[in-house]
Amino acid sequence: YRTRHAQYKADPQSRRLHAAHPMIPLWDDHESANNPWVGGAENHQPGREGSWQQRRAAALQAWYEWMPVRDPAPGQNRGDYWRSFAFGDLATLVTLETRHSARAQQIEYGDHPGALASQEAADHFLRDVVGATGRPMLAPAMETLVMDSLAASVRSGQPWRLIGNPIPMARTAAPRLSAADLTRLSSAAPAHELERVARLAERGALGLPLYLDPWDGYPAAREQFYAGARDAGASDLLVLTGDSHSFWANALHDASGSPQGLELGTSGITSPGDFALFGEAGARLLDERLIDSNPEVLWTDGLHNGYLRLRLTPSQAVADYVAVSTVLEQEYGLNRLRRMHITPGSGGLDWEWR
């Protein structure tokens, strides 16, 4: 892990970035292993790779050594990494830790093949397996910090409450794909992606989540988070999200349909977009079907690399979704894909595209 961090930090543009700007970094999964939880990881094999606890400890130690953050307080668990920042009278930002402090093991579709047998089986799977209580995402101490920070922000009259969130929060079912869609995607996708097309079609036909590693795999924990924010007087969250290699603009709601805020998701800097291997036409088709299949998804782009630029003033927020023309050369062009204007409203957040 130290060698890999050193490799990244040797990049001249990474050095310039760290020299020029303060950063508030969050980890997700690949700082340790793919899809970790408190007791292991999807891509950790104890028989060949030893103790998960030792591997995680090494990963987190290297992360603290190489990233621009303070070391934990004496006696504090390195995995208990959550923070709150107040930006004057403008905003509060609270960052979440969703991997190493409380997360229950992910549910895998492959372990429940019967969930795809019928709509009744899929509904049972979502309700009683994925939706089972007692599967936490956040540590209780972190939830206390988050809700106390949100309540303090509301009391002080700050207009904005931001959540630094490693993984997608919105309800995102797999896209519903027609026979014609499948034909188009099968002709556009490389051979190793054809199995993925079939999985998307199966899940989409039954209204099952696109993925179960994000908050969609922990709906009871998500409802608990929303309830805490609501009790703090904060149903106007701006949730800033990474992980998915895609751009997102999502309208968040609790199970009763009450608005909880907006989620702004950024694509990867250099990692391929989630649908990039389907080519431009295939990626656009999948984006359109995701929007059609999900009331919470206002817009998404799974093709481009880039970044999200968010500017806050007391009266409005402006979110620019910026794509880069290439990640293979130092010279590149910028293209603003969408611009969202957001204003505080009486019932949460109002927004429009401009």
What is each residue range found by the language model?
Residues 1-354:
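Metal-dependent phosphoester/phosphodiester hydrolase catalytic core
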